[in-house]
């Protein structure tokens, strides 16, 4: 197997990606797919770090998304490549390409390979909240993450808090469900407190109307 992911690279070669199709790369790699994925991941880090440090002006980070796609096609369960790759893609200029939509697409690709990976759903929610200022979409993804096997108990309250800001009616419905069904006393307490706060906000809004 001969890969353009091998390191170190010469300065002229570092901006060239000979294989851009993950399917083609998988065919070339045969039984060496995990190794090839590791090599492409190393090149991804080199590419992102190099352009970030030098503040490259000529098509900065141009290979970032193709490299991440190759890496995760060669190894569909490469958790670090999905999670850190999404951070790289979403990072705003000049420190990154500022492509949150590509970051979300990468994490959604990860969910296709591992549908119950709550971390990917949580990361998508965070990108919606932090990079896209879309609290409603963030709340839906946090809620989805909280429902996945192995998700930590704190995810429910995070989703509830975000949803309260984005969609009070939906938040109230979910908070009541959480308060009634959770086996964790502290989760029920948070849900009940958020419900009380939400009701107070609605009462104030009616008085001001």
Regions found by a protein language model. Give the residues of each.
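Surface-exposed peri-terminal alpha-helical interaction modules
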Residues: 1-5, 108, 133
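Short secondary-structure transition/capping segments
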Residues: 122-135, 161-172, 197-207
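Intrinsic low-complexity, intrinsically disordered or marginally ordered coil/linker segments
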Residues: 4-7, 117, 151-152, 170, ...
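N-terminal alpha-helical interaction modules that lie
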Residues: 1-80, 85, 181, 199-209
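Short, hydrophobic/aromatic alpha-helical segments in well-folded domains
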Residues: 67-68, 106-107, 123-124, 141, ...
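Alpha-helical repeat scaffolds
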Residues: 62-63, 99-111, 135-147, 168-184, ...
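Helix-turn-helix repeat elements of alpha-solenoid scaffolds
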Residues: 15-21, 56-65, 95-104, 129-136, ...
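Amphipathic alpha-helical repeat scaffolds of TPR domains
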Residues: 32-53, 74-92, 115-130, 151-162, ...
């Amino acid at each position: 197997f001969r890969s353009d992911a091998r390191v170190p690279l010469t300065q002229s070669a570092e901006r060239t990606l000979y294989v851009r199709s993950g399917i083609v790369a998988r065919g070339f790699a045969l039984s060496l797919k995990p190794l090839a994925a590791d090599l492409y991941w190393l090149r991804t880090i080199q590419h992102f770090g190099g352009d970030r440090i030098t503040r490259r002006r000529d098509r900065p980070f141009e290979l970032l998304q193709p490299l991440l796609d190759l890496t995760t096609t060669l190894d569909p369960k490469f958790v670090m490549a999905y999670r850190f790759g999404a951070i790289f893609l979403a990072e705003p200029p000049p420190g990154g390409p500022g492509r949150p939509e590509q970051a979300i697409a990468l994490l959604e690709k990860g969910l296709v390979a591992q549908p119950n990976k709550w971390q990917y759903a949580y990361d998508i929610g965070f990108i919606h909240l932090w990079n896209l200022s879309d609290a409603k979409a963030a709340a839906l993804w946090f809620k989805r993450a909280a429902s996945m096997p192995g998700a930590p108990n704190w995810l429910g309250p995070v989703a509830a808090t975000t949803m309260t800001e984005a969609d009070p009616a939906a938040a109230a419905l979910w908070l009541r469900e959480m308060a009634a069904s959770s086996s964790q006393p502290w989760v029920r307490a948070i849900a009940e407190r958020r419900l009380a706060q939400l009701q107070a906000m609605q009462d104030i809004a009616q008085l001001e109307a």
